[in-house]
A protein has these predicted regions:
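HAD-like aspartate-dependent phosphatase fold
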Residues: 1-20, 24-159
């Protein structure tokens, strides 16, 4: 992109949202141009935000990682799929909805903050199941989630 094209692109937007893994960083390594790009955008008055489909990590953890990589970020600058799915369930089904969480404790914490009521088994009659990435999930939890969906609970999936 030529310099005039880049300036025109920056000047025509109030905000820019960036996916994280593969765009801002690769695993634990920052993409070399990312810190300077974010700085330049911010210096030109463009709001910078980050989106991730990683439901396993809290936005505080992600913001700390970005800051450590030379990209200052606050938790409010980061939106995760866990936040999106818990907000969706709370909006569609309302506070007080019983949800079976088949994901990391991050999703459980966000569900509670949104007024949802996490339960642990299909026998507690959850009205919804929220499934998300959890590298340590046990088959018994997936089984309970499947039983709940089979019994009529709405199934919400996140990465």
């Amino acid at each position: 992109m030529t310099r005039p094209m880049t300036e025109a692109l920056i000047d025509s937007h109030d905000a820019a949202l960036f996916d994280l893994d593969g765009v801002v960083y690769l695993g634990s390594e920052v993409v070399p141009a990312a810190p300077a790009t974010m700085s330049r955008l911010r210096a030109n008055g463009v709001g910078v935000g980050f989106v991730t489909n990683n439901a396993a990590r809290a936005t505080t953890v992600v913001a700390d990682q970005l800051t450590d990589m030379g990209i200052p970020a606050a938790p409010s600058d980061v939106v995760s799929s866990a936040e999106a799915v818990t907000a969706l369930v709370a909006t569609e089904m309302g506070q007080g909805t019983r949800v079976l969480i088949a994901a990391t404790s991050n999703v459980d914490d966000l569900a509670r903050k949104r007024g949802l009521v996490p339960v642990h088994g299909a026998d507690e009659h959850p009205q919804a199941v929220i499934q998300g990435y959890d590298p340590e999930i046990e088959w018994s939890r997936l089984e309970e989630a499947a039983f709940a969906v089979q019994a009529g609970a709405r199934w919400y999936a996140s990465n």
